[in-house]
């Protein structure tokens, strides 16, 4: 029984370290990647994709046009 508890605790600790590593990596990449403060986020007016933030696109079709939306693809 003690062996199973020790293995479970080791598994939990390893998982926590792995998740923290990914979180730290994303935080570092945010610092490295230069972001334009003037870029458009959700519902910001746009005329082209360059008006929107990174990974966001200018909606050209649908009910609402010429707004920035996140690119899921």
UniProtKB/Swiss-Prot annotation:
Further comment found in the protein's record: Hardly affects the DUM voltage-gated potassium channels (Kv) (15.4% inhibition at 10 uM) and the DUM high-voltage-activated calcium channels (HVA Cav). Does not affect or only very weakly voltage-gated sodium channels Nav1.3/SNC3A (<10% at 15 uM), Nav1.4//SNC4A (<10% at 15 uM), Nav1.5/SNC5A (no inhibition at 15 uM), Nav1.7/SNC9A (no inhibition at 15 uM), and Nav1.8/SNC10A (no inhibition at 15 uM), HVA Cav, and Kv in rat dorsal root ganglion (DRG) neurons.
MF (Gene Ontology): ion channel inhibitor activity; sodium channel regulator activity; toxin activity
Propeptide: 21-35
Stored InterPro entries: Huwentoxin-1
Tissue note: Expressed by the venom gland.
The species this protein was found in: Heteropoda venatoria (Brown huntsman spider)
Protein name (Swiss-Prot/TrEMBL): Mu-sparatoxin-Hv2
Record remark on domains: The presence of a 'disulfide through disulfide knot' structurally defines this protein as a knottin.
Subcellular location, record wording: Secreted
């Amino acid at each position: 029984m003690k062996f199973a508890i020790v293995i479970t605790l080791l598994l939990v600790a390893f998982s926590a370290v792995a998740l923290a590593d990914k979180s730290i990596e994303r935080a570092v990449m945010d610092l490295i990647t230069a972001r334009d403060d003037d870029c458009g986020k959700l519902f910001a007016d746009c005329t082209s994709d360059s008006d929107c933030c990174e990974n966001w696109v200018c909606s050209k079709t649908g009910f609402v046009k010429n707004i920035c939306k996140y690119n899921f693809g």
